[in-house]
Amino acid sequence: MSKKLTFQEIILTLQRFWNDQGCMLMQAYDNEKGAGTMSPYTFLRAIGPEPWNAAYVEPSRRPADGRYGENPNRLYQHHQFQVVMKPSPSNIQELYLESLEKLGINPLEHDIRFVEDNWENPSTGSAGLGWEVWLDGMEITQFTYFQQVGGLATSPVTAEVTYGLERLASYIQEVDSVYDIEWADGVKYGEIFIQPEYEHSKYSFEISDQEMLLENFDKFEKEAGRALEEGLVHPAYDYVLKCSHTFNLLDARGAVSVTERAGYIARIRNLARVVAKTFVAERKRLGYPLLDEETRAKLLAEDAE
């Protein structure tokens, strides 16, 4: 019987595969976020006309999902392997199935289903056509063709493939609890993450200072606005991410009502939309440097008319 891939070997296998498909291997972005989609490597690069192919691991924090390390499959923080390709290759689904084969999962020997699940992120004004990928009855991946990001229509269309690494590893290693996953030879997932899971859950549900978080949200929102007034897209977006994580902490604490919740989401969305518009305008000002010369000249000429 062949040795099962460790968690880090799964990551390395996916990195090698998508590198061979022309993706840049980016590193996780150093700001809290609820999903890999919120990284600037996806959110910003999915808009505008320039091509973009990238793959990266993104630790994703969802305070309300914390379970003190007691639930085998529900986590405060999990890991996503994110692939974004713009324009979307016509064979992206075939490439995805090929990536599963590299992980030792033969699509012909398993029940792999693409279940329609159109995606929406209200806090960033983003939406797209999507599918969940189910492997023998368990969701392991989200597939999305972005139609709108930051309130802007996407053209060309960006394809996003988001692997849930913990679920994938649980399946490959045949374990029932994420904490029993082998991260590396001789080191289990729980030996690294169960204590942080407990502590972050306790903080999110019991200890966090609600007044401080409410004040921080207002300050982060204001600072994002100040940065945008100066045309500073990336610092502004960092503060949008901080607003989002702060809201998630408030939500986990039960500190916002249903009505207030909608208001906070709208405030984050409004900022994200301004960031998106400012980013596209800045790329245009720079002459769309990632485009080939012919396409760049054509687009800039059209914009000048």
Swiss-Prot record:
Subcellular location: Cytoplasm
Gene Ontology CC terms: cytosol
Domain of life: Bacteria
Reaction catalysed by this enzyme: tRNA(Gly) + glycine + ATP = glycyl-tRNA(Gly) + AMP + diphosphate
Record-linked InterPro entries: aa-tRNA-synth_II/BPL/LPL, Gly-tRNA-synth_heterodimer, Gly-tRNA_ligase_asu
GO biological process, one term: glycyl-tRNA aminoacylation
Cleaved signal peptide residues: none
Subunit structure and binding partners: Tetramer of two alpha and two beta subunits.
Protein name (record): Glycine--tRNA ligase alpha subunit
Gene name of the record: glyQ
